[in-house]
Amino acid sequence: HYYGWSDIFSGDDWYGNLQQMVKTNFLQAALIYIVVMMIASVVLAVPGVTFAIIAGAIFGPWWGTLLCVLSATLGAIAAFLIGRFFLQDSLRDQIAKNRYISRLLFDKNTKNEMMVLMITRLVPLFPYNLQNFAYGITDISLGKYSLGTFVFMIPGVAMYTVGTYALTGASNKLLYIGLTAAIVVAVMVLSKTLRKKYVSEEE
């Protein structure tokens, strides 16, 4: 049985209906989520946090994290390619307005490319959508950019997907709340360390 939108949102238990639809038609639901997130993140610049929360609520902590990171990576690759082949000149003017991105991405004495990727993905000083396009006009390869983006987005995404699941669908809430807290602390410590060690040097 395939649920239509009217079936999902009819009645009081729309959230339960949505979860049942996902279980019954997982591949279709996952593909819809990936396509919608890619379009929304690249074209509409919708914050990725929104989709991380949605993923945690309807796909759970593990599939939600994987699908959100995969979708965000595909969207980031699309922005990277657009920046590399179509927006070179206009992007340089935009990037020049953000001293952090311009120095980290274009300073000849900067750290290695994977380190820069980790910094920009984990330190909340860099507009996410802008950096995706900005990487397109650097010398980094598409393969390295894609791999680094996927890996370094996992902690930030998991923080929201696991946290959302802890509040909405977890049978063992304390376990997932504790896991969320551990991820939050780890992300904050790593972000602060990277900012202090690398970003402050650029200021």
Mark where each language-model region is:
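Extracellular/periplasmic helix-loop-helix junctions in multi-pass membrane proteins
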Residues: T161-I177
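Membrane-interfacial helix-loop-helix
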Residues: Y2-Y33, T73-L130, I137-I140, G169, ...
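Glycine-rich loops and low-complexity Gly/Arg-rich segments
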Residues: L142-K144, N172-K173, V184
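Hydrophobic alpha-helical membrane segments of integral membrane proteins
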Residues: L27-L70, D107-A166
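Alpha-helical transmembrane segments of multipass membrane proteins
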Residues: H1, A40, L44, G75, ...
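Hydrophobic core segments of alpha-helical transmembrane domains in multi-pass membrane proteins
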Residues: G178-A182
